[in-house]
């Protein structure tokens, strides 16, 4: 298939874009197109006026019947329609679970004010069903509240519900308890996997049904699966998911999204295929044309930036390149979704990882060099896209919300500390097992195992030698309280010196994020997998502590006997200090330049991981998570104590 011809210089692309920027046009208008030799490009009448978009919003459109559809006639190229009117999707991604609920409205208003008409979001299974059969749609996970807020603001919604979402999340958004059974095959019609999917759908989809367009809601489309073409191991899986959604009452447009080279293996019959890409080029739509020549083009993810990994560089993308690409989408009548409009944060242990020869964890920030920053600030990309969208609009865009000021608080100097070994008694009852048990198979959390955090394996030994263990992702090895080495994917052996007396062998293993892409997800069990041996003799009789770092643990930890912080301390420990936020807390960023590796907890809430290898050097702290005046700050530092924790009003990513 040839690429689209260049737009004729006598035809104004802005005029063309004005015709198709139509989620808000007045009812009754349906522009016509002449048939082009290349079906991708239709010519609008050069004198076609711009239109007022105010009558086709979720609040204004009362009489609904047909929803978002596709149309292909001999008079023009294929296009989307909404309630019979020609429609072009200007979408932007915001993940409700990566943004404090108190800031949802602000981010959605900024999306609307930029000129977008649609918000898209993934729905993470692992967060909504953290334990098998235990569902959570409350607080920051209140999907319905987010969708209804979008409607109230005047935005349509494209919902991308998990099973698998990728999205740089731990295990691609799949619950870790699925890894308990080695016979369960992820993203297939394997009986055990399908049973879990069915139960999840039985709780999720009834919440989505009343939010659909034809139920007077804002949801105009639902994604069936995410990038299955890159995974495709079961030809019956996609048709199964398609039917599962229809059977439960999803009536809006269904779609799939895949990389441009994986559309053929990722699409399924009866579902619109969309693509994900970084830039347009000659062969962008070749595979898409092969599977659906008579359907409109939809770019489900246009990557305006990229994610970062620990030890890698910070990724940025030029704003002019983004502006040019989006103007090309408009020129060629391509519906699109900007990924990400606002990335937010991988708070807590939410981050995923990549595996391309080695395991690399995703950083805490999901800034993504997006249209809005991690803290919701405007960027050059925002200003350029807003100007572009205004140029094709018949009416002024909404006024942009004002940015609240950031704060620089006094440095926090921890005054108390608690070595990890003194905190063990405040953890839940340890597991005692003959052999090591991997994180997912620990008999805790109502049989769902441990999803995130760290796990400590303890065993008394009386002789040294060659220690061997498979630890995922990284393990610190101690004799009593003294660290003697590190185990990881590339280093499975360690020499233990000869012992005069029996000592405690302690292996502290951290999950740095499960891989979120590729078939590697099937093998992402964490902790120690397999046996632990010294001189090829397997060890037996382990005490296993789970360090999930939940808020309930920090509530218990407050009653511990903390000690004054020494000048220097090596080894894992908790450090406690106070952040003084004054009477009106504001957003800030915490700088931990003189600390090494660990996690920050504010009033028991996990902000995420810090690591001195970068690229990320600051952690975003939302002001809405701070109390007036005094706030408890606890660091779990794995290596060596630092001095103070500085507050700054600018991030270093």
From Swiss-Prot:
**EC numbers on record:** 3.2.1.-
What superkingdom does the record give?
Answer: Eukaryota
Give any GO molecular function from the UniProt entry: beta-galactosidase activity
Please provide the Gene Ontology terms (biological process) for this protein: galactose catabolic process
Primary enzyme class: hydrolase
- Per the UniProt record, one Pfam family is BetaGal_gal-bd
Question: What does the UniProt keyword field contain?
Answer: Glycosidase, Hydrolase
- Catalytic site: 227, 301
Q: Which SUPFAM superfamilies match?
A: (Trans)glycosidases, Galactose-binding domain-like
Q: Tell me the InterPro entries matching this sequence.
A: B-gal_1-like (IPR026283), BetaGal1-like_ABD1 (IPR048912), BetaGal_gal-bd (IPR048913), Galactose-bd-like_sf (IPR008979), Gly_Hdrlase_35_cat (IPR031330), Glycoside_Hdrlase_35 (IPR001944), Glycoside_hydrolase_SF (IPR017853)
**Which Gene Ontology cellular component terms are annotated?**
vacuole
Which cysteines are cross-linked by disulfides?
none
Mind telling me which PANTHER family this protein's record contains? BETA-GALACTOSIDASE RELATED (PTHR23421)
- Family label: Belongs to the glycosyl hydrolase 35 family.
This one is known as Beta-galactosidase-1-like protein 3
């Amino acid at each position: 298939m040839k690429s689209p011809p260049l737009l004729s210089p006598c035809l104004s692309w802005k005029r063309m874009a004005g015709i198709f920027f139509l989620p808000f046009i007045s009812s009754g208008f349906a522009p016509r197109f002449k048939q082009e030799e290349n079906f991708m490009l239709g010519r609008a009448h050069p004198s076609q006026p711009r239109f007022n978009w105010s009558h086709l919003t979720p609040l204004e459109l009362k009489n609904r019947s047909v929803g978002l559809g596709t149309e292909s006639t001999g008079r023009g190229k294929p296009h989307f329609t909404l309630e019979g009117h020609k429609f072009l999707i200007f979408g932007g991604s915001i993940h409700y679970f990566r943004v404090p609920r108190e800031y949802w409205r602000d981010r959605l208003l900024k999306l609307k004010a930029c000129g977008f008409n649609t918000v898209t979001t993934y729905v993470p299974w692992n967060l909504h069903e953290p334990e098998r059969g235990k569902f959570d749609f409350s607080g920051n996970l209140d999907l319905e509240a987010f969708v209804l807020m979008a409607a109230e603001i005047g935005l349509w919604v494209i919902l991308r519900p998990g099973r698998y979402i990728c999205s740089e999340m731990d295990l691609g958004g799949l619950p870790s308890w699925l890894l308990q059974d080695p016979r369960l095959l992820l993203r297939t019609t394997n009986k055990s996997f399908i049973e879990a999917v069915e139960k999840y759908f039985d709780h999720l989809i009834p919440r989505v049904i009343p939010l659909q367009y034809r139920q007077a809601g804002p949801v105009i489309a639902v994604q069936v699966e995410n990038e299955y073409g890159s995974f495709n191991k079961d030809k019956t899986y996609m048709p199964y998911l398609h039917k599962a959604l229809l059977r439960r009452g999803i009536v809006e447009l269904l779609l799939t999204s895949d990389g441009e080279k994986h559309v053929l293996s990722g699409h399924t019959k009866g579902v619109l295929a969309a693509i994900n890409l970084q830039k347009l080029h000659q062969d962008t739509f070749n595979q898409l044309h092969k599977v659906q020549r008579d359907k409109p083009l939809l770019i489900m993810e246009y990557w305006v930036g990229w994610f970062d990994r620990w030890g890698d560089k910070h990724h940025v993308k030029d704003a002019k390149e983004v502006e040019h690409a989006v103007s090309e989408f408009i020129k060629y009548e391509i519906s699109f979704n900007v990924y990400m409009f606002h990335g937010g944060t991988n708070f807590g242990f939410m981050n995923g990882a990549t595996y391309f020869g080695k395991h690399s964890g995703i950083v805490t920030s999901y800034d993504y060099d997006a249209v809005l920053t991690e803290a919701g600030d405007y960027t050059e990309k925002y200003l350029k896209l807003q100007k572009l969208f205004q140029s094709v609009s018949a009416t002024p865009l909404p006024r942009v919300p004002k940015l609240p000021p950031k704060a620089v608080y006094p440095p926090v100097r921890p005054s108390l500390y608690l070595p990890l070994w003194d905190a063990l008694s405040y953890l839940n009852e340890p597991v005692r097992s003959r052999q090591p048990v991997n994180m997912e198979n620990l008999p805790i959390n109502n049989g769902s195992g441990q999803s995130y955090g760290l796990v400590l394996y303890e065993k008394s030994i009386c002789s040294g030698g060659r220690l061997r263990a498979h630890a995922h992702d990284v393990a610190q090895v101690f004799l009593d309280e003294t660290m003697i080495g590190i185990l990881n994917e590339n280093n499975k052996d360690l020499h233990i010196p000869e012992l005069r007396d029996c000592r405690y062998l302690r292996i502290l293993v951290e999950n740095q994020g499960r891989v979120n892409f590729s078939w590697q997800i099937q093998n992402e069990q964490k902790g120690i997998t397999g046996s632990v041996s010294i001189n090829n003799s397997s060890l037996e009789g382990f005490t296993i502590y789970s360090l999930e770092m939940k808020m309930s643990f920090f509530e218990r930890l407050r009653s511990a006997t903390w000690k004054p912080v020494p000048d220097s301390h090596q080894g894992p420990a908790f450090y406690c200090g106070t952040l003084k936020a004054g009477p009106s807390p504001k957003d800030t960023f915490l700088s931990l330049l003189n600390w090494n590796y660990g996690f920050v907890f504010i009033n028991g809430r996990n902000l995420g991981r810090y690591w001195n290898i970068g690229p990320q050097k600051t952690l975003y702290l939302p002001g809405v998570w701070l109390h007036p005046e005094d706030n408890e700050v606890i660091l779990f530092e794995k290596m060596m104590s630092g001095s103070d924790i500085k507050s700054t009003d600018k991030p270093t990513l």
